[in-house]
Amino acid sequence: TTETVANLSERMVLPAPLCDTQFVIDGDKFLSQWGLAKTFTTDILSASSIDFQTTATQQRRENGNEQGAAEDALGGSAPATITFSAICTDAVEHKEWQISKSQDFSTVDYRFNEETIDYTFDEQGSYYVKFIGSNSDASCTNESDVYTVSIGESLLDCPNAFSPDASPGYNDEWKVSYKSIVEFKCWIFDRYGNKMIEFDDPSKGWDGKYKGKYVKPGVYYYVIEAKGADGKEYKKKGDINILRSTRTDRNETTE
């Protein structure tokens, strides 16, 4: 950058450079007209002052049956994966992300000597995250604002009825409603004990099909084993009522 100074005193105080910098002084404008201007060039000054900018970006899941966090909050439903990034100036030699369960960071649970980290929060509670940067001799140190990550208590609710292929897009798939479920297994059976489907992702569901065809209306049964981010264990059993459709062109399985 170039800066014009009208009146130069004996001393000029400049802010410490954020990157290795060389200063060049040209003057004065009257001597320049006669071709007698003088130029003074400093040695390259190594950066000692530091600066950085940080961001935190959560990987959002578009699961309609998951109760997550608000758009402007971090955390919500576990597992929550968040990318913490720092953009640093040249003089930042020592870089560290800290994660703590203590708001005052009296105890630091995790340290990462990287500019960018991906961290997955899979236990219920509040976490505090900050970035610390310093120059080579630690004579200049700075900290970022603290990011708060709140992981909520677990929740698992199961519906007892749905109507596959009756009204596309509305109650046509059986899904649990959940929050902060970190382990999940679900089996669905017919009344004879035949397994209709098995899945291990709570965001998934059952479309009412068996071997590619819709099953007949009636009562089916689910068994669920799950674990929440708060350590709560779930063992659920119940019935699923498939409601009869008025459609006559259904491609159903026969018993």
Model regions and ranges:
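Accessible peptide chain termini
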Residues: 1-2, 206
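Short, compositionally biased serine/threonine- and acidic-rich segments at solvent-exposed termini, linkers
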Residues: 2-161, 179, 249
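Short loop/turn motifs at secondary-structure boundaries
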Residues: 81-84, 147-255
